[in-house]
Amino acid sequence: MASVAGDSAMEVVPALAEEAAAEATGPSCLVQLPGEVLEYILCSGSLTALDIGRVSSTCRRLREVCQSSGQVWKEQFRVRWPSLMKHYSPTDYVNWLEEYKVRQKAGLEARKIVASFSKRFFSEHVPCNGFSDIENLEGPEIFFEDELVCILNMEGRKALTWKYYAKKILYYLRQQKILNNLKAFLQQPDDYESYLEGAVYIDQYCNPLSDISFRDIQAQIHSIVELVCKTLRGINSRHPSLTFRAGESSMIMEIELQSQVLDAINYVLYDQLKFKGNRMDYYNALNLYMHQVLTRRTGIPISMSLLYLTVARQLGVPLEPVNFPSHFLLRWCQGAEGATLDIFDYIYIDAFGKGKQLTVKECEYLIGQHVTAALYGVVNVKKVLQRMVGNLLSLGKREGIDQSYQLLRDSLDLYLAMYPDQVQLLLLQARLYFHLGIWPEKSFCLVLKVLDILQHIQTLDPGQHGAVGYLVQHTLEHIERKKEEVGVEVKLRSEEKHRDVCYSIGLVMKHKRYGYNCVIYGWDPTCMMGHEWIRNMNVHSLPHGHHQPFYNVLVEDGSCRYAAQENLEYNVEPQEISHPDVGRYFSEFTGTHYIPNAELEIRYPEDLEFVYETVQNIYSAKEDTAE
């Protein structure tokens, strides 16, 4: 837990300590040293915040040194929370003692909320109102985010439940901020850099836990521009693009000079830096995230085009984006300025295909079909982002049934932020809530949100009456079921009906047939699934059929499965299970097994003792044999 050094700094200075200090004489007395020397000593790094608080309480002289210039507490702040220093300007006036106390208070409050989440939301997904506590906290948001990051960086195998909920809270807070920024961005007029900025917002929203900033992306692209300039200097040492300063929006109009820039771009991107279209793994969301495109040096047509466009326009070549079907392109005008132009007055650039320059006919060959002239037109920022998000939406729909549908949820949020009246997507969003079971614990704010969505759909398209009616009925039935729910079900191994249960929660197992590694987080004395599931999974073909214990397991591939006892065996080489929900059920991995968190232990109160016995018998025996 965070220390309380800030409180010590506020203690009243004892009168006797001041008198004793005043009577001291000679150069050996600490308080007689020059202030700069005292400050240097106190900032040396060997003293903790608690030490500084105690020093400040000894006499007025030392308290003044600690607080007057602020350097002492600034150093304590920097050492304790180094990642926050980037948010301060050297010219800002900051009361560092107060800043330290505010940050520490924010950390304590954030940890208190994180600690409460497991008890409140163990049985279901965190509801929409679940984050209201942290949204309503007073103090800078960056302080709360920083504390959540500190929790995530705790020792790898411990505090798993804290990390699980800290990650969810941080994910939510950052996405809300990014979505608000995106909505404000969409209200601004278009300019050439807007394409890149909009793409970075999409990247950030889908990867809120990654350290992605527009400034960093710009810096990486600027380094590419510098390489292009170096190549361009070898082609034409007097090229006007070489005199452009960063941030300028100047354009060169001569076709020959533009062509020289494009030749230099093609050489740097595709020959020198080895960028290429990702044909081998085309349907991968990483191909649409700009920070990944720059890191992995590969992408799909739209992301490669945005990179190419940004570099070209920074060097004065006015390329434009073309929302060509199945293959995003750029167009390069060959006509005279001010003349009436048609689609044949442009060359079309395929950034996915190493910057190849295409005619209209070659564009049709590229996709294997004839298209109308309208599809060769330039598109604005919003349309470009719509296509990017549409690609992510398609990928999200491909996610397996055992996944969290996080990409689908994120892309739906982004699409509806741009186009809030898309009826089919609103319906999909409502169905997704039902499928994932994202319901509130004590209130029905999310149910009401779904009902609002459905009412909005009905207003937009009365023809959807049937689908809306079904979902409304489903929602109201859920409300009634919530009212009838009973308390926590406790399963005792000692009960006669559980005598056949051989394994327990927290044990790392291996599936005999499929070979996957997993950890048990629940069990039933017999199969509790419906007849259809039993039939589809061919349970009757098992020697013991459905009349045997079944186990809920978290699998290393991210799926959750329901496995028969006869198909499981102890994993002789237990390893961590990299499943996103491990922290929901377990607090620690010991190296041989998982320790259930308080909420899971309430439901299986006798399992932990059995786990210890099993681990002792299985893994200790193995160690003895090895010796």
Curated annotation (Swiss-Prot):
Pfam families: F-box-like, Transglut_core2, YccV-like. CDD domains: F-box_FBXO21. It comes from Mus musculus (Mouse). Substrate-recognition component of the SCF (SKP1-CUL1-F-box protein)-type E3 ubiquitin ligase complex. GO terms for molecular function: DNA binding. NCBIfam families: yccV. The lineage of its organism: Eukaryota, Metazoa, Chordata, Craniata, Vertebrata. SMART domains: YccV-like (SM00992). This is F-box only protein 21. The gene is Fbxo21.
